[in-house]
Amino acid sequence: MDEGNSQAFMPLASTPQVASMTPPVAVQTGDGVYSNTQIKAAIKSGHIVFHPYIEEHIAGSSVDVTLGHWYYRTERNTNGGFYNPFDEGDVQKYFDGPHSAETHQIWAEANCRKLFSVIPADQPIIVLAPGERILAHTHEFIGIKAPGTSTMQARSTWGRNGVAVCLDAGWGDPGYINRWTMEIYNMNQHHFVVLPVGERIAQIVFYHTGPVEGQYKKLSGKYQTDTDADLGSLIQNWRPEQMLPRGYKDKRRKTLPL
């Protein structure tokens, strides 16, 4: 792990003291996707959590989220072999990190490169090699309480630039509120790609659902620390290690007969 505490990069103006995240204060009624007016109303009522709140990031039917500071590299062991994602030890070996994004200036000096145009020298960046995949996170803590669910989609600009942001895991169950983990993959075969920290990289879409029985943590919540915690506690207790997959927590079941 890089030197320093996992919370070294926590540029949130303050730790908000808010009520318990369950049950919701109010529930938006309707069908389908939340519109921007419904999103704003749900944020105001406490049914949707979006912190830090930036109104300009609320689009017509989604909320833009930005790239956070921490990341894990994958497949750092180039000797090949087998990876068992259901073994906690294998998971720890497979993922390299967590790493903290370096400033543009420091990265350029370390790699004997000139500064890239447009990107400020003091901007933290993550540089992906051709074909490289990393685990990264949103800077924002975001999600919706039950009833309701959400998905994360890459912003189209990144897709057009050959970068997959949510490779295959962009679903947020009812009640999941946290920083979201992103599987970012550079699909370019010959070009490195620069990812500035703080850049809008994905968008969260919220959906209406019917009543939900049970809480996220009890139903499927391997990645939520405490559904009853307030937002301030989530922010204070967040660690980069929460990005790592936890398939080893699933119960193994015998194959059902045909």
Label the model's feature ranges:
Residues 2-258:
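DUTPase catalytic domain/fold
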